């Protein structure tokens, strides 16, 4: 399961980049989506790698994101009681563990919005014009995406 965060805006970009970000449901900077590891999604991520930060998210970070930033339709916070009543999972932590392991999907909890609206990272991005290998924030973070998501909680 990949966590994908939009880091750069789409002004003066090619139409196909904008369309791919729209297909990934990334409409604003600092929004995050959770994407399964399939060839179609990996190709989409590869196309917009210069506008996003992405990597493999772990269960602990995913649980914290769902508790703090998970929203239902109507901008209602996601709670353990709602997850227990409306899905087969016993709570947010159980759902996050299944989601990180690939056994669950976001649609298993009805009414859960697919986009997590995050804060800008505390202490800021390193730079939004360079890749991670060059000392920036763009591109593939691997397991270090959890550090970025923690700063954006």
Curated annotation (Swiss-Prot):
Superkingdom of this protein's organism: Archaea
Keywords: Ribonucleoprotein, Ribosomal protein
Entry annotated with the keyword Ribosomal protein: yes
GO molecular function, one term: structural constituent of ribosome
GO cellular component entries: cytosolic large ribosomal subunit
InterPro entries tied to this protein: Ribo_uL30_ferredoxin-like_sf, Ribosomal_uL30, Ribosomal_uL30_arc, Ribosomal_uL30_CS, Ribosomal_uL30_euk_arc, Ribosomal_uL30_ferredoxin-like
Similarity comment: family membership: Belongs to the universal ribosomal protein uL30 family.
Assembly and binders: Part of the 50S ribosomal subunit.
Name assigned to this protein: Large ribosomal subunit protein uL30
Species in which this protein is naturally found: Methanospirillum hungatei JF-1 (strain ATCC 27890 / DSM 864 / NBRC 100397 / JF-1)
């Amino acid at each position: 399961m990949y966590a994908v965060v939009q880091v750069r805006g789409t002004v003066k970009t090619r139409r196909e980049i904008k369309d791919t970000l729209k297909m990934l449901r990334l409409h604003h900077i600092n929004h995050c989506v959770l994407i399964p590891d399939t060839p179609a999604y990996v190709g989409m991520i590869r196309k917009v790698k210069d506008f996003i930060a992405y990597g493999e998210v772990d269960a602990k970070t995913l649980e914290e994101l769902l508790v703090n930033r998970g929203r239902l339709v109507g901008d209602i916070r996601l709670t353990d009681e709602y997850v227990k009543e409306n899905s087969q999972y016993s709570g947010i932590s159980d759902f996050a563990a299944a989601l990180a392991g690939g056994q669950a999907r976001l649609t298993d909890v009805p009414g859960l919005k697919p986009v997590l609206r995050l804060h800008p990272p505390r202490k800021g991005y390193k730079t939004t014009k360079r890749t991670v290998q060059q000392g920036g924030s763009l591109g593939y973070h691997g397991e270090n995406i959890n550090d970025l998501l923690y700063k954006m909680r």
